[in-house]
């Protein structure tokens, strides 16, 4: 039986804004929902967007499985500027810093900044 809890549905939406593909994530991102997140991000990357923005505004937690999926997607895009992590909260930012990935990704304070506004 499928569950519709936010834990199981990490992707809140995908939209195109000002030429960028924006993937809005929500809740706790971990081993249990990483496959859905990974699949969605890889599908978006396959569309070769000018910029793929991962909106982390509503994310409360990320684990190493999710960080690995983000690294994989960025590698598929081939450019550090092609994938932007927007508006990570304190816990998410801390996970990126502790893992050293804050130097691997472009990270912006807000979604608007990620969109070049």
Regions found by a protein language model. Give the residues of each.
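STAS-typified acidic loop motif
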Residues: 2-39
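Intrinsically disordered, low-complexity segments enriched in polar/charged residues with Gly/Pro
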Residues: 1-2, 94
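Short alpha-helical segment
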Residues: 113-114
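Amphipathic alpha-helical interaction surfaces in cytosolic regulatory modules
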Residues: 31-105
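Short acidic-hydrophobic, aromatic-tinged amphipathic segments that line or gate anion-handling sites
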Residues: 106-110
């Amino acid at each position: 039986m499928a569950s519709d809890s936010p834990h199981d549905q990490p992707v809140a939406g995908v939209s195109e804004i000002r030429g960028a593909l924006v993937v809005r994530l929500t809740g706790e991102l971990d081993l249990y929902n990483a496959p859905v997140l990974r699949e969605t991000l890889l599908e978006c990357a396959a569309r070769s967007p000018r910029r793929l923005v991962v909106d982390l505004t509503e994310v409360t937690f990320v684990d190493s499985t999710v960080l690995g999926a983000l690294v994989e997607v960025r590698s598929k895009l081939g450019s550090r500027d092609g994938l932007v992590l927007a508006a990570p909260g304190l816990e998410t930012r801390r996970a990126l810093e502790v893992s050293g990935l804050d130097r691997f990704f472009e990270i912006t304070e807000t979604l608007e900044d990620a969109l070049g506004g």
